[in-house]
Amino acid sequence: MAVIKCKPTSPGRRHVVKVVNTDLHKGKPFAGLLAKKSKSGGRNNTGRITVRHVGGGHKQHYRLIDFKRDKDGIPAKIERLEYDPNRTANIALVLYADGERRYILAAKGMQAGDKIQSGVAAEIKTGNAMPLRNIPVGSVVHAVEMKPGKGAQIARSAGAYVQVVARDGAYATLRLRSGEMRKVPVDCRATFGEVGNAEHMLRQLGKAGAKRWRGIRPTVRGVAMNPVDHPHGGGEGRTSGGRHPVTPWGVPTKGYKTRSNKRTDKYIVRRRNK
């Protein structure tokens, strides 16, 4: 994997930094694991904008990823690594011994031809998945479930990982990259290793159009709007907004705590670092 800075042959190329991975499959994805992906433009069923800055972009197919890794005891081989437009991580097409194919997240160091396995009997090796009760304390893992059988929810993006720091009774304690320490049931599954494509953070799109290809629309400052559109809007000439920063709906921003799910507070041992 290489980080390439483009020659400044045009204003749109001047600041482009690409991440090139020659190991990725150059053909079409596996058709049996594709699903239709409709664009909403950020609108809900009533036509109102519920998510800002969304719209347009290249047409995409969703890749059905196996986040549960519940095919226990059946060895599998990595057929190839692929690009996935729906996430920052790359994905791997896996062929099981019984003939079934699935997509999984491509871990750091994973290559075509590698053997992987899921379940209690799997060895401690990058790409293998098993319950947290069987994972040694101190191990680095990714694709961690929060509820047994629900599928991975933690550490799924490029370069992500968590560390198992303790195990006590029915819960294992994980240290997340944010600094948060969190308890997770020991029956939840995790996959050894880090998520691959960590160089993704080094890329630079270089121009506004590259954002539009990805379906991301412009973000307009509140002070540049009219009063009807934003609490910071209006005024004669340029203004500073005239109040502490708020969202378009008047909720304080920049450090204001909005977490309200007290029910799961008991699972957070330590809040994330600021």
Curated annotation (Swiss-Prot):
Keywords associated with the record: Ribonucleoprotein, Ribosomal protein, RNA-binding, rRNA-binding
GO molecular function: rRNA binding; structural constituent of ribosome; transferase activity
Entries under Pfam families matching the protein: Ribosomal_L2, Ribosomal_L2_C
InterPro entries: NA-bd_OB-fold (IPR012340), Rib_uL2_dom2 (IPR014722), Ribosomal_uL2 (IPR002171), Ribosomal_uL2_bac/org-type (IPR005880), Ribosomal_uL2_C (IPR022669), Ribosomal_uL2_CS (IPR022671), Ribosomal_uL2_dom3 (IPR014726), Ribosomal_uL2_RNA-bd_dom (IPR022666)
Region (Disordered): 223-274
A GO cellular-component term linked to this record: large ribosomal subunit
GO terms for biological process, alphabetical: cytoplasmic translation
Keyword Amino-acid biosynthesis: no
Function per UniProt: One of the primary rRNA binding proteins. Required for association of the 30S and 50S subunits to form the 70S ribosome, for tRNA binding and peptide bond formation. It has been suggested to have peptidyltransferase activity; this is somewhat controversial. Makes several contacts with the 16S rRNA in the 70S ribosome.
Family named by the database record: Belongs to the universal ribosomal protein uL2 family.
Known partners and oligomeric status: Part of the 50S ribosomal subunit. Forms a bridge to the 30S subunit in the 70S ribosome.
Name of the protein in its database record: Large ribosomal subunit protein uL2
Native source species: Shewanella baltica (strain OS155 / ATCC BAA-1091)
Taxonomic placement: Bacteria, Pseudomonadati, Pseudomonadota, Gammaproteobacteria, Alteromonadales
